[in-house]
């Protein structure tokens, strides 16, 4: 009986690993808070594994609270941003814990072409936390008037990550 329980425990532990990035076919959904100069909001991402260390996906941000400029409130299009993104999931390349994924990447959106650096840690096979920062590399509109800087500057995101 003791050997049976030991074997059962080993099987449960080895089959319930919380791997952060599994490669091709892996799907991650993340939702969290977004912080930037002049506004805070929500961010969500959806990433699809396309190779052992590569993923492609989409990101959307909406500023729930955005500062008015010259007593003018920002419109929906000033608060919203959508991006297509490519990540290099390098946690296993750097021989990090399999529950931890580090992913630098590039994104192309409605406001800019930029870079991001993210990390996620999974507590279970389905649930973890993430943090991500992003910066614009090339802005489509370089005027610094009005609401051009919203979603077009250094942005910090933090939230929950889910395996789908």
Predicted regions and their residues:
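Primarily recognizes Gram-negative and organellar outer-membrane beta-barrels
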Residues: 20-34, 66-70, 99, 143, ...
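Gram-negative (and chloroplast) outer-membrane scaffold detector with strong preference
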Residues: 47-125, 162
